[in-house]
């Protein structure tokens, strides 16, 4: 008798995988185990909850029980997996165990909180659960410090500013989105945030946080300090690899998988934010959707290597939206930038004259798909 497929996790990657499996096989036993409620919500919506006055419960799209009934699943919510015995094909919690034929790790990633004094005063917004824990504080806060000027930090800064809050955005780098693109490209967004009233503290590092009568005092390494009501860590995500380590599979930054989404153990796979696919961590929706399509085939006996085309990454900053694609982080590209009132096109060219990356904004985003077709990958 088939012991079926177990998926650990309940986020976007797990749900996409379930849907793709059920398109091909209505009956293979499917079990999902996760530490949260397993209710469905759209994680990117977390970047806009404050300006849209949404409570955590407003984000729920489908209850766990409805999902289980729709796709013929066994669900175990609020369940922490303690260990995996890869040789015996057994998943263990504190008081239960499950046998599997194939196991999929879809454990996601956790928000990194800088290891400074007072780090317990920092909030994170990496899940509906995390937002639920701090929504009252964030709604009531008037002065907000966001630590980290990457994708999420920039999105949150704009959202909190649109909600009428006093926002300070801090980053170690000299420009926003520094790990994604050069300053001459990100400067359009940077200037717009400044014009909106966001106070930028670039080339700045947080040293400590202290509770005061007036709120929270944030002290920088420079000894400059500011008083705020809430501090949000937007300093990146760390793939969740602890379970994979316990199972004895190879991990690096993420859970290492090949083009078949297979780990170093032949019956254990990984997908989504926790996975490192041939050396790349790709925590974006489109590669996860494609990964789910291919992994579903492979779990059901197929042998389909994942092929990822050039894909768009969308920066959800509504007043100055950006799309980017290609190797925008490369330092050896020559950038050709056309900036006009209706938007910007920035093309990153290699020494051989090939288009290796691009960033488009506002009304020029409609040109993104044509540029994708000419992108060298």
Swiss-Prot record:
One of at least two accessory proteins for anaerobic nitric oxide (NO) reductase. Reduces the rubredoxin moiety of NO reductase. The gene is norW. Its main location: cytoplasm. Keywords: Cytoplasm, FAD, Flavoprotein, NAD, Oxidoreductase. It comes from Salmonella dublin (strain CT_02021853). This is Nitric oxide reductase FlRd-NAD(+) reductase. Its cofactor is FAD. It is found in: Cytoplasm. It catalyses: 2 reduced [nitric oxide reductase rubredoxin domain] + NAD(+) + H(+) = 2 oxidized [nitric oxide reductase rubredoxin domain] + NADH. It is an enzyme of class 1 (oxidoreductase). Pfam families: Pyr_redox_2, Rbx_binding.
């Amino acid at each position: 008798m088939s012991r079926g497929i177990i998926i650990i996790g309940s986020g976007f990657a797990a749900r996409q995988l379930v849907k793709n499996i059920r398109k091909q096989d209505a009956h293979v036993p499917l079990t999902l185990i996760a530490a949260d409620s397993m209710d469905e919500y759209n994680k990117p919506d977390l970047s806009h909850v404050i300006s849209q006055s949404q409570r955590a419960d407003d984000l729920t799209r489908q209850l766990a029980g409805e999902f289980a009934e729709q796709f013929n699943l066994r669900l175990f919510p609020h369940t922490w997996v303690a260990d995996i015995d890869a040789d015996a094909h057994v998943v263990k919690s504190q008081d239960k165990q499950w046998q599997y034929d194939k196991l999929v790790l879809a454990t996601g990633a956790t928000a990194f909180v800088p290891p400074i004094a007072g780090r317990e005063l920092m909030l994170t917004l990496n899940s509906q659960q995390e937002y639920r824990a701090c929504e009252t504080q964030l709604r009531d806060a008037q002065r907000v410090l966001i630590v980290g000027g990457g994708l999420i930090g920039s999105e949150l800064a704009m959202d909190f500013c649109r909600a009428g809050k006093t926002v300070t955005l801090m980053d170690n780098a000299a420009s926003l989105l520094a790990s994604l693109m050069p300053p001459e490209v990100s400067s359009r967004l940077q200037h717009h945030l400044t014009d909106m009233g966001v106070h930028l503290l670039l080339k700045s590092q947080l040293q400590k946080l202290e509770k005061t009568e007036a709120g929270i005092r944030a002290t920088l390494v420079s000894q400059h300090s500011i008083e705020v009501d809430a501090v949000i860590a937007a300093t990146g995500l760390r793939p969740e690899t602890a379970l994979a380590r316990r199972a004895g599979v190879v991990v690096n930054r993420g859970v290492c998988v090949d083009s078949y989404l297979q780990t170093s153990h032949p019956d254990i796979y990984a997908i989504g934010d926790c996975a490192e696919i041939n050396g790349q961590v790709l925590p974006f929706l489109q590669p996860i959707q494609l990964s789910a399509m291919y992994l579903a085939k492979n779990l059901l006996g197929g042998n389909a290597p994942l092929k990822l085309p050039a894909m768009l990454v969308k920066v959800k900053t509504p007043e100055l939206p950006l799309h980017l694609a290609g190797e925008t982080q490369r330092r050896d590209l020559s950038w050709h930038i056309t900036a006009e009132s209706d938007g910007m096109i920035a093309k990153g060219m290699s020494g051989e004259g090939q288009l290796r990356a691009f960033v488009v904004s506002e009304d020029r985003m409609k040109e993104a798909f044509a540029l994708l077709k000419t992108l060298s990958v």
